[in-house]
Amino acid sequence: EIAQCLVGSEMCIRDRPTDDRQTTGGRNNMKVVSATKVLLYSGLLAERDRETLFEVNALLPQFEYGREYDQESFLVAMQSCFQTTDDREAVTIMASNIVNTQQGTFSDDGVSQQAIIKTGVTTKDAAFVPNPVSLIPYRTFLEVPQPASDFVFRISEGRGGAPAFKLVAADGGLWKSQAVDNVKNYLVKALADVPDREKITIIA
């Protein structure tokens, strides 16, 4: 956990020689640098500088937005890189039932798409591709709520006429500030009962 790692660092700080603790004033700063990185800094040293005491980085599944995936890779990524939501299920069902473009057709007006999907053993129906879709990817520390974002879901013809799928972010990166706030709020609550809590300043 983020908090456990950083609290462990704080315990080490209190075990430092007295001269070191007097130099830093016994205070430390915890900074949420980004949605995936938290640093613990010392107080000001004699050189009016700060020492980086600890760094915690989120380990997350990787998904490349804007990249085209083949059908199998896309379906696996949807299951492993996104939380379960109605829109995720709609995208997954659509992607899993798309007919090879050599057998079916796509129509695209620049805003919405229509594709041929399988509805039975031999039956094929036209279905509109859901857009935009609200999805919740794993993009920040797993201990905190993951921000939802809108994405444009696109289907195109890939190698050999097989369908290809991609998701394009459509929120302008607003999720990043929300994720940083979520991490900060988590740390404030998780460290509330730490001894000398008043000597730790959490900033974002």
Annotate each PLM feature.
Residues 30-33, 48, 53-54, 99-100, ...:
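An exposure/low-complexity boundary signal
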Residues 3, 36-37, 50-51, 56-57, ...:
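Generic N-terminal initiation segments characterized by hydrophobic and/or small/turn-forming residues
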Residues 63-113:
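Membrane-inserting effector segments that mediate pore formation, membrane fusion
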Residues 58-63, 80, 168-173:
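Charged, low-complexity surface segments at secondary-structure and domain boundaries
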Residues 1, 76-80, 93, 97, ...:
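Charged/polar, solvent-exposed surface patches and flexible loops
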Residues 10, 15-47, 114-204:
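Amphipathic, membrane-inserting segments
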Residues 40-68:
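A glycine-rich, hydrophobic loop/mini-helix early in the fold
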Residues 1-8, 12-13:
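Single conserved hydrophobic/aromatic residue that forms the stacking wall/gate
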